[in-house]
UniProtKB/Swiss-Prot annotation:
SMART domains: CLECT. One of its GO terms (molecular function) is toxin activity. InterPro entries: C-type_lectin-like, C-type_lectin-like/link_sf, C-type_lectin/snaclec_domain, C-type_lectin_CS, CTDL_fold. Disulfide bonds join 25-36, 53-142, 119-134. Residues 32-143 form the C-type lectin domain. It comes from Protobothrops mucrosquamatus. Negative results: does not show affinity to coagulation factors IX and X in the presence of calcium ion. Also shows no inhibition on thrombin. PROSITE patterns: C_TYPE_LECTIN_1, C_TYPE_LECTIN_2. This is Snaclec trimecetin subunit beta. The keyword Cell inner membrane does not apply. Heterodimer of subunits alpha and beta; disulfide-linked. It is found in: Secreted. It holds the Pfam family Lectin_C.
Amino acid sequence: MGRFIFVSFGLLVVFLSLSGTAADCPSDWSSFRRYCYQVFQQKMNWEDAEKFCTQQHRGSHLVSFHSSEEVDFVVSKTLPILKANFVWMGLSNVWNECAKEWSDGTKLDYKAWSGQSDCITSKTTDNQWLSMDCSSKRYVVCKF
């Protein structure tokens, strides 16, 4: 009886220690570290893509990257499905928010940005980010 309790307790410890290592993702989502990812084969503009992601799962948004390993994981999921293409990332209007002053140090008190806002895409083949018109249609990767 004592041996059974010891073995049962040992299995419980192993289960509990492993339960926190991966995300608890829906069956059609892929997990990497503590996050869940889903590649969608629909093309949409950035705003619709972000809204779409928020409707897929609580806490879901367009993909964000925080390491080269995370990019490699997403590439491993997107490339077989989407081939060489682009997916939206959760970055937009970066140029409007970036520059707060001119290179000579004077305050940016006048702006003449074009009406076109820029959003950021990631290539499905490697870790390259590109600025594109937010109204263009690209594939979607959601993350939560």
